[in-house]
């Protein structure tokens, strides 16, 4: 399974990298070394380090593609063979598996290059192994901890690693003549580190030394034998000085790392490890060497800089014969060496502790198990009397880059594990990026990432930043600029896993789980350790953590005193403080609040990052918002003072543009340092708010000549002029909103979401109210919904409804019968066509007929109401009165002569308009033929409205149905009187006629009123002609018995009812449809009697009553269920109590029985003891009687013997008594 990075890290020419030069193989002939120092080491093929020449290690090593090792012939050597390129060939382990020819004395540290040197004359009898002898290193952790390391690492090997403890003074004294020949010298001022199977010591490279290839080996050997005792004796005296030197040196390179950087170039760390299984190519030491080689590929190809560089490596073995060493001297030497050992660095696998869940490792060797067994037997057969060591024991030496600031663990202890936000960002980003690029290239997994395995080094003298660049598909770059105090180096790869270009996997065989590629394991373990680190909350912390590339920083007015000074000083300090620092306010409380408001969001982002580190792969974490501030390029970041890293290995020409702050009073506006030279430019915009910045940019015109005073530290001039105060005030408001949206707490976000949801709910409720769900009707539609409760619907319609249909106005209420805006236009066209036809017919009519015919309604209203204010006139409507009946309705303004044929034996009164249903049947709608008339009466002004019952006339004389004004005035002449007489006759005839309605109750009725007009007076606003009708749900009754029942109702009740309606309509004059409950207006309920439920002339509400009954039954059932449940619970509780009581009684009874039984047994035991005592007494008596030759108790003796048991009988049988007894 390979990890493909699709978002942030793009696969480029990752394998097309230049070859990495290294040391070549040279024969072992004529090699020389210094006798006392460990300065001359050799490679795996026995090449001397003296022949390497000068090693050019510079700060530019991160940006260069090659390192040149100038040696014999000035040839460039390859670190990895050409066979190991991506050609499908496997890795060549032949150099690793070879037995080394280089030998050294473990007791004195002398190196020898000749296996033929026979030192048989040396007496080795004086050297004895002391069981209590300490090694030259100590275990950092307890011995009981389980280590997943290679086998034989824990074996006690009788090797004194005094090569690490040679005193620097003795080296100078004994090698004063040959100091120039030493290429490397041990730096004894620096503490050595050690672990389970090896140690780490530090050497210095003498660049000014001359290469002398000829050394006197004989003199060296003699000096080694003669000065061994001096070496061991002087260690006691000089160790105390070394401790003090280390303390001073340690503080100097941690705190003054930049000053000592030149010295660090010539300092290297040599990691010496015991090769437990020399013929196993997957041994721990070999694995680490292979992994370091391939990680160097990333370093040399400019893809990473967060791994320690492997300078060289070599193998060595101790000599077969050891020199003479006294026991006391060896003990002193070992004791002195232990004082110089501290926590492990570069090799924390010596102290690695793993969980018990890991599996044990199983070693599979290429050459069999014979060599493995031989190494085991050799290490175990070393006795106190023998000092000979077989050549199978080997040591691997890795020359690594030196980290002058120690481990992250040491750095954290010195600082009490308190880091600033900028330090945390640089630390986490470097760790995450190094894992991301190594996973991309080699599927690398560390498997042991903790604070002890993270090294810290200072920046080189001429470097200040690390610029990481990732090229996207569109040609642009993602840039991250990391600065600060240190560079992170991940070390110790003894337990790591890597996939080679030849698809061969290098992993720990004792842990099968490590063979699988797990991208989250390293960060998962590392994130759990981050909880130890605390974030400093200092007022001088930089504000770049919350800025973006195009963000504008604006300070408050209260911080004017410190804005210029703080920002100018911070811009030249570092990348984390490139922007303005936090202002110092006068009040400490305000300052603390401001700091918390800016730091808390970063802390929240940090906690989110820690959570996501446990789930997401490293390459996705690079785009986390916690690292957004790293995308801002500081002003002092240049290609010369930065280490450039690219994900594809090709350093681009493009470099991120820095930002230069411009100051204008209390405000800071960040703009590019090299803007386009134009006369008019736009105001800097933010990525989030585009609309606001566009408005501002239109109003701003910046002159070409700058009129702005730059701070003294800034050398870049800007052609921008400061904006006006109004523009800045506008921009401040916008920026505050933006900052609030950027740094929102989780609680605030939840509150805003809740507020938004509430607003949405309110909008939905408003829409529902408009659509009619709450009882109101929208302006474009009139929807009458039938409800099961006995509501009274009051319909209002405006004066526009009396004439042609028109869309609703804002002042008037909703139109009765209006369906939608589209239907309005259709109805208007139909009415206009019908009006044209009517006009042609009216011109042909006679004058007599013209008197009886009403003019158009608007003209009629003006004529009858405004001109005749004192007269009462009855006007009928020409419009649709929409009812909740499902059947469609037709309106007839002037009924033609053909309509009476459709309605036989019935004519329509002259004063009533006609509403006729369609005769065409429809699906789901009953076929009905009904005629309903609705007269409306207007008194004095249009806001006085009266209702009368619609009646049908059976006058067959009226051949044509004509709509007339019905006048009750005395001024009217004979025509009006005749009409009144006709109406009286019609009333008598209509008593027998029934108004049939829909059986389902979808019908309307009009409340009867007396002839007195004052009974039904309802007041409305002026200029609003509105009428209302009262309708009921469910079954509705006709007229037969309705009149008789309503006669029983007194006028007082009617007056109360209509007064209540009048008050309601005054409160809600423009409401389209309002629902009035009978409970709210009890007087209205008396108008609709409920005595006769099944009769045709009463209001029957069977459905409601059924529902009420069902609801009551449900409630009763629920109550019964609850009661039953309560009873069951009580019964259960009683049963439980009874059971507990029974158990208690049984326990008590058992205890009593046990006591009684014990008493009974004790009584039996006492009785038996008493019987035995009696027997003993009797036996004594028998013995006495025997002496006296008498036996008076023979019978009793036999009887007691039977009771005692068979034991006495057996004795008696075996030894019978005398006859005398």
Curated annotation (Swiss-Prot):
Pfam families according to UniProt: PK_Tyr_Ser-Thr
EC number per UniProt: 2.7.11.1
Keyword terms: ATP-binding, Kinase, Nucleotide-binding, Serine/threonine-protein kinase, Transferase
Domain Protein kinase stretches: 186-627
UniProt biased composition (Basic and acidic residues): 591-604, 757-769, 823-850
Start-end of Low complexity biased regions: 24-37, 112-127, 173-192, 204-263, 324-344, 538-550, 559-584, 725-738, 959-993
InterPro entries: Kinase-like_dom_sf, Prot_kinase_dom, Ser-Thr/Tyr_kinase_cat_dom
GO BP annotations, alphabetical order: intracellular signal transduction; mitotic cell cycle
Leader peptide range in chain numbering: none
Active-site residues annotated for this sequence: 448 (proton acceptor)
Phosphoprotein keyword on record: no
Molecular function GO labels: ATP binding; histone H3T3 kinase activity; protein serine kinase activity
GO CC terms in record: cytoplasm; nucleus
Biased composition (Acidic residues): 746-756
Class of this enzyme: transferase
Catalytic reactions of this protein: L-seryl-[protein] + ATP = O-phospho-L-seryl-[protein] + ADP + H(+); L-threonyl-[protein] + ATP = O-phospho-L-threonyl-[protein] + ADP + H(+)
Region of interest (Disordered), residue spans: 1-37, 104-133, 173-263, 324-346, 538-604, 712-782, 823-858, 959-1008, 1105-1152
Gene3D superfamilies: Transferase(Phosphotransferase) domain 1
Amino acids binding ATP: 192-200, 271
Domain of life: Eukaryota
Family classification: Belongs to the protein kinase superfamily. Ser/Thr protein kinase family.
Protein name: Probable serine/threonine-protein kinase DDB_G0286465
């Amino acid at each position: 399974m390979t990890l493909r990075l699709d978002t942030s890290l793009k696969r480029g020419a990752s394998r097309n990298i230049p070859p990495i030069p290294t040391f070549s193989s040279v024969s072992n002939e004529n090699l020389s070394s210094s006798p006392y120092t460990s300065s001359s080491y050799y490679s795996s093929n026995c090449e001397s380090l003296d022949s390497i020449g000068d090693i050019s290690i510079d700060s530019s090593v991160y940006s260069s593609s090659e390192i040149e090792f100038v040696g014999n012939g000035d040839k460039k050597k390859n670190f990895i063979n050409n066979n190991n390129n991506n050609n499908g060939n496997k890795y060549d382990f032949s150099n690793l598996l070879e037995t080394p020819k280089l030998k050294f004395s473990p007791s004195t540290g002398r190196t020898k290059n000749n296996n033929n040197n026979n030192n048989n004359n040396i007496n080795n009898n004086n050297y004895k192994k002391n069981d209590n002898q300490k090694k030259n290193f100590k275990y950092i952790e307890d011995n009981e901890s389980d280590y997943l390391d290679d086998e034989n690492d824990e074996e006690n090997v009788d090797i004194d690693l005094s090569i690490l403890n040679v005193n620097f003074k003795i080296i100078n004294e004994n090698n004063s003549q040959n100091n120039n020949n030493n290429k490397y010298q041990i730096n004894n001022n620096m503490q050595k580190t050690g672990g389970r199977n090896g140690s780490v010591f530090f050497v210095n490279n003498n660049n000014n030394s001359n290469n002398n290839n000829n050394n006197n080996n004989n003199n060296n050997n003699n000096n080694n034998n003669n000065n061994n005792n001096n070496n061991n004796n002087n260690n006691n005296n000089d160790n105390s000085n070394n401790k003090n030197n280390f303390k001073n040196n340690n503080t100097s390179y941690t705190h003054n790392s930049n000053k000592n950087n030149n010295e660090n170039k010539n300092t290297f760390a040599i990691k010496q490890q015991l090769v437990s299984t020399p013929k196993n190519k997957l041994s721990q030491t070999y694995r680490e060497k292979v992994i370091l080689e391939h990680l160097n590929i990333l370093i040399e190809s400019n893809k990473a800089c967060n791994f320690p560089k492997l300078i060289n490596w070599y193998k060595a073995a101790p000599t077969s014969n050891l020199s003479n060493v006294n026991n006391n001297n060896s003990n002193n030497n070992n004791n002195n060496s232990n004082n110089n050992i501290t926590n492990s660095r570069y090799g924390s696998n010596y102290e690695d502790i793993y969980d018990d869940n890991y599996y044990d490792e199983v070693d599979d060797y290429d050459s069999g198990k014979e060599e493995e067994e031989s190494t085991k037997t050799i290490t175990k057969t070393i006795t106190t009397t023998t000092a000979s060591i077989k050549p199978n024991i080997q040591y691997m030496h890795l020359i690594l880059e030196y980290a002058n600031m120690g481990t992250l663990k040491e750095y954290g202890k010195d600082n009490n594990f308190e880091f600033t936000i900028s330090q945390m960002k640089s630390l986490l980003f470097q760790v995450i990026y190094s894992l991301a690029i190594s996973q991309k290239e080699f599927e690398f997994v560390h498997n042991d990432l903790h604070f002890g395995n993270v090294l810290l080094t200072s920046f080189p003298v001429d470097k200040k930043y690390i610029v990481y660049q990732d090229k996207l598909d569109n040609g642009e770059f993602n840039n991250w600029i990391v600065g600060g105090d240190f560079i992170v180096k991940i070390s110790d790869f003894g337990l790591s896993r890597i996939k080679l270009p030849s698809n061969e996997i290098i992993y720990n065989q004792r842990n099968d789980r490590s063979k699988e590629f797990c991208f989250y394991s390293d960060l998962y373990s590392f994130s759990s350790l981050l909880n130890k680190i605390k974030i400093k909350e200092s007022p001088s912390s930089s504000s770049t953590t919350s800025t973006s590339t195009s963000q504008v920083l604006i300070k408050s007015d209260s911080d004017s005193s410190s804005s210029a000074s703080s920002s100018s000083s911070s811009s030249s300090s570092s990348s984390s403080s490139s922007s303005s620092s936090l202002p110092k306010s006068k009040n400490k409380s305000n300052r603390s609040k401001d700091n918390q408001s800016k730091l808390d969001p970063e802390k929240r982002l940090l906690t989110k990052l820690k959570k996501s580190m446990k789930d997401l792969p490293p390459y996705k974490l690079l785009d986390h918002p916690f690292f957004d501030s790293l995308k801002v390029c500081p002003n002092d970041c240049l290609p010369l003072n930065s280490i450039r890293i690219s994900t594809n290995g090709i350093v681009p020409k493009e470099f991120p543009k820095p930002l230069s702050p411009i100051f204008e009073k209390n405000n800071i506006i960040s703009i590019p340092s090299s803007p386009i030279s134009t006369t008019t430019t736009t105001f800097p915009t933010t990525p989030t708010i585009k609309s606001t910045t566009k408005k501002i940019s239109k109003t701003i015109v910046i002159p070409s000549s700058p009129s702005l005073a730059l701070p003294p530290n800034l050398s870049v001039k800007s052609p921008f002029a400061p904006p006006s105060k109004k523009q800045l005030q506008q921009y401040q408001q916008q920026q505050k909103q933006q900052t609030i949206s950027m740094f929102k707490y989780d609680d605030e976000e939840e509150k805003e979401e809740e507020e938004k949801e509430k607003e949405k709910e309110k909008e939905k409720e408003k829409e529902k109210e408009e659509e009619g769900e709450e009882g109101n009707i929208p302006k474009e539609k009139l929807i009458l919904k039938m409800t099961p409760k006995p509501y009274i619907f009051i319909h209002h319609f405006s004066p526009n409804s009396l004439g042609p249909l028109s869309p609703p106005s804002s002042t008037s209420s909703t139109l009765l019968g209006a369906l939608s805006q589209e239907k309005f236009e259709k109805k208007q066209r139909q009415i206009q066509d019908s009006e044209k036809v009517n006009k042609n017919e009216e011109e042909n009519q006679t004058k007599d007929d013209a008197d009886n015919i009403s003019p158009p309604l608007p003209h009629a209203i003006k004529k009858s109401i405004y001109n005749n204010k004192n007269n009462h006139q009855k006007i009928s409507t020409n419009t649709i009165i929409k009812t909740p009946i499902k059947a469609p309705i037709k309106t007839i303004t002037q009924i033609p002569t053909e309509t009476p044929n459709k309605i036989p034996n019935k004519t329509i009164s002259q004063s009533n308009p006609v509403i006729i249903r369609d005769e065409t049947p429809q699906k789901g709608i009953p076929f009905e033929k009904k005629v309903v008339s609705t007269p409306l009466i207007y008194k004095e002004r249009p806001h006085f409205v009266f209702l009368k019952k619609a009646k049908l006339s059976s006058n067959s004389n009226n051949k044509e149905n004509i709509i007339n004004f019905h006048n009750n005035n005395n001024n009217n002449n004979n025509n009006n009187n005749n009409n009144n007489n006709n109406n009286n006759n019609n009333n008598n005839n209509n008593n027998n006629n029934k108004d049939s309605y829909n059986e389902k109750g979808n019908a309307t009725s009009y409340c009867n009123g007396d002839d007195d007009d004052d009974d039904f007076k309802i007041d409305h606003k002026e200029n609003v002609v509105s009428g209302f009708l009262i309708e009921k749900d469910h079954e509705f009754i006709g007229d037969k018995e309705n009149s008789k029942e309503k006669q029983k109702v007194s006028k007082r009740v009617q007056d109360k009812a209509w007064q209540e309606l009048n008050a309601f309509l005054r409160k809600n004059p423009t409401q389209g449809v309002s629902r009035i409950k009978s409970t709210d207006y009890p007087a209205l309920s008396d108008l609709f009697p409920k005595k006769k439920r099944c009769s045709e002339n009463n209001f029957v509400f069977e459905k409601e009553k059924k529902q009420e009954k069902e609801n009551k039954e449900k409630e009763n059932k629920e109550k019964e269920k609850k009661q039953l449940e309560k009873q069951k619970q009580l019964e259960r509780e009683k049963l439980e109590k009874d059971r507990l009581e029974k158990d208690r009684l049984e326990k008590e009874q058992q205890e009593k029985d046990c006591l009684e039984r014990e008493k009974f047994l004790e009584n039996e035991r006492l009785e038996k003891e008493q019987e035995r005592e009696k027997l003993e007494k009797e036996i004594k008596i028998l013995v006495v009687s025997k002496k006296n030759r008498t036996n008076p108790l023979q019978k009793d003796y036999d009887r007691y013997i039977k009771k005692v048991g068979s034991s006495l009988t057996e004795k008696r049988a075996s030894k019978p008594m005398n006859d005398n007894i």
